[in-house]
A protein has these predicted regions:
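Gly/Ser/Thr-rich beta-alpha loop segments that engage phosphate groups in nucleotides
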Residues: 6-10, 93, 111, 118-122, ...
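Short beta-alpha connecting loops at secondary-structure transitions
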Residues: 59-65, 107-113, 123, 127, ...
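Feature representing long, continuous alpha-helical segments
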Residues: 74-77, 104, 123-124, 137, ...
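Short, charged, surface-exposed loops that flank catalytic or proteolytic processing sites
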Residues: 66-74, 133-138, 159-163
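Short, small-residue alpha-helix embedded
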Residues: 63, 115-146
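Alpha-helical structural signal
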Residues: 17, 122-126, 165
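Glycine-rich phosphate/dinucleotide-binding loop and adjoining beta-alpha-beta core of small-molecule
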Residues: 1-108, 177
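Charged C-terminal helix
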Residues: 149-181
Length: 181
């Protein structure tokens, strides 16, 4: 289940997100799904035995209680371990971190992807890969790499400043072909 894309900050959203934490299925929290837990990160402890993935950008990460001072990789690894979640810290060199301490920095992607909706594409890819049964860290790494590669293809074809999240979607098949053929 994916929660947060376009959710908004209206009254009741925070309580809704906290109630969804009790569901048994894998849960991906993005954007306002993460913001809804700000100040309530202890609620994640109820999900330690279930797959939970957070996909914040740096601002959402800090609002959720993350500390970037030790550097992005260390910060992501520490947060994932402390809260028992998988974390995809978006930004230059997106980081995927697992609760067991594993951490990966992604080499694909570019600054043209830093716009509203790009993270929604990533979150959708991630929840789709989890739905296919990929192990969580593999799903995180694959989604992040494919998302970044689709962004690199879009930048080459339409330019960094003109690319949109739809351009990412259009290039996912080409990115997939690069690793499957």
């Amino acid at each position: 289940m994916l929660v947060g894309c376009g959710l908004g900050r209206s009254p009741g959203c925070d309580g809704l997100v906290r109630r969804l934490l009790d569901l048994p299925r894998p849960l991906v929290l993005d954007a306002d799904g993460i913001n809804a837990l700000s100040g309530h990160m202890d609620a994640l402890s109820r999900r330690r035995d279930r797959i939970t993935v957070l996909t914040p950008h740096e601002g959402e990460f800090v609002r959720a209680g993350g500390d970037l001072s030790p550097g992005r990789e260390r910060a992501a690894a520490d947060f994932a371990r402390e809260h028992g979640v998988y974390l995809v810290l978006k930004g230059p060199g997106t980081i995927a971190a697992a609760p067991d301490g594993r951490c990966m920095r992604n080499p694909t992607g570019n600054c043209g992807m830093a716009k509203g909706g790009s993270g929604d594409v990533l979150a959708g890819m991630l929840v789709s890969l989890l739905g296919l049964g990929l192990p969580p860290m593999d799903a995180c790494c694959a989604a992040v790499w494919l998302h970044g590669r689709a962004g690199d293809l879009a930048a080459r074809q339409v330019g960094l400043w003109g690319m949109t999240p739809s351009d990412l979607l259009d290039r996912i098949p080409a990115a997939l072909r690069e690793v499957t053929e």
